[in-house]
Swiss-Prot record:
GO terms for molecular function: structural constituent of ribosome; tRNA binding. Gene3D superfamilies: Ribosomal protein S10 domain. The lineage of its organism: Bacteria, Pseudomonadati, Pseudomonadota, Alphaproteobacteria, Rickettsiales. This is Small ribosomal subunit protein uS10. Keywords: Ribonucleoprotein, Ribosomal protein. GO terms for biological process: translation. Part of the 30S ribosomal subunit. InterPro entries: Ribosomal_uS10, Ribosomal_uS10_dom, Ribosomal_uS10_dom_sf. The keyword Ribonucleoprotein applies. Involved in the binding of tRNA to the ribosomes. It holds the Pfam family Ribosomal_S10.
Length: 105
C-alpha cells in the first residue's frame, strides 16, 4: 500500500494560516508529488464572559472569544525530496504544524 504524510496546521489568525498552507503546497508541488488539500477543518471558538466591575453591577459583562482555525494537507506516496522540501519551508511564528507519517499496510 501507499504511505501518506498528514500535515495538520493550526493558528489563531486565518491569514497567516492560509499563507503557510500556500507555501507548503507550492514546496510539495515543486517535487511533483500528489497533494490533497488544503482541507479546512471546523474552527473552534472559545468564549469567555467576565464581569466588567469587580464589586457590583452583575448585569454588566464583557465577552471575549478565541478562534482556532485548522487546515489538513495529505501527501500521497511521498519521496525523500518531499521530506527535504518540507524541512526547508519557513513558516510564520503563529502557525502550529503537526506532521504524521501513516503507513498504508
Amino acid at each position: 500500500m501507499k504511505n501518506k504524510i498528514k500535515i495538520r496546521l493550526k493558528s489563531f489568525d486565518h491569514r497567516s494560516l492560509d499563507q503557510a498552507t500556500k507555501e507548503i503546497v507550492s514546496a510539495v508541488k515543486r517535487t511533483f508529488a500528489t497533494i490533497n488539500g488544503p482541507i479546512p477543518l471546523p474552527r473552534k471558538i472559545e468564549r469567555f464572559t467576565v464581569n466588567r466591575s469587580p464589586h457590583v453591577h452583575k448585569k454588566s459583562r464583557e465577552q471575549f472569544e478565541i478562534r482556532k482555525h485548522k487546515r489538513l494537507l495529505v501527501i500521497d506516496d511521498p519521496n525523500p525530496a518531499v521530506v527535504d522540501a518540507l524541512s526547508k519551508v519557513d513558516l510564520a511564528a503563529g502557525v502550529d504544524v503537526v506532521i504524521e507519517l501513516e503507513n498504508g499496510e
